[in-house]
């Protein structure tokens, strides 16, 4: 019996360094996951700002050197000159779709607006981290970000379908047609929206990875607790 007790004590002493190493690895793992999660949250907020800017700003397409009229178009707001002065006449409102020059512009406004609402809802869901399972919240946000990216893709693809409208042709020339800008050019808000698609896809992928890591982290914690209980039971 004394020999068995001594052997058990020696085995327990040998296990201590391994347990300490596992605990250190676990601590670093948790710290790194939290740091990545904070960065993910910050970039999600940045993406939301980009989305709002793309939705509001009327600089998706604009005039060029050879355009008949000066002006610029956004999703739902546009300004065109009259050819006699440098003043621009502005029209369009998101609350009044009848003022939009094309059905494609209406559809694009809807999808980009939906994308904006989804990413804002995703940020609101950050409060769920205080009440719900962390992995579940990450996965909810990931699906919302992925859907937001899909809406952005639809909006950016549908928007050029409205370039054949009379108002756009008045600014860009008669050579303007669907997906052909004529004498006009793509402006920064459209480019920013396309970059936002890539941003949203990366954020959603990262959220899925963080959610899965949280699941594996919980499984490792459960295994560690079971090992401690088994070692204590064997010592007894």
UniProtKB/Swiss-Prot annotation:
InterPro entries: LHFPL. GO terms for biological process: sensory perception of sound. PANTHER family: LHFPL TETRASPAN SUBFAMILY MEMBER 3 PROTEIN (PTHR12489:SF13), LIPOMA HMGIC FUSION PARTNER-LIKE PROTEIN (PTHR12489). This is LHFPL tetraspan subfamily member 3 protein. GO terms for cellular component: plasma membrane. It is a multi-pass membrane protein. Belongs to the LHFP family. The chain crosses the membrane at residues 36-56, 110-130, 140-160, 191-211. It is found in: Membrane. It comes from Homo sapiens (Human). Keywords: Membrane, Transmembrane, Transmembrane helix. The gene is LHFPL3. It comes from the Eukaryota.
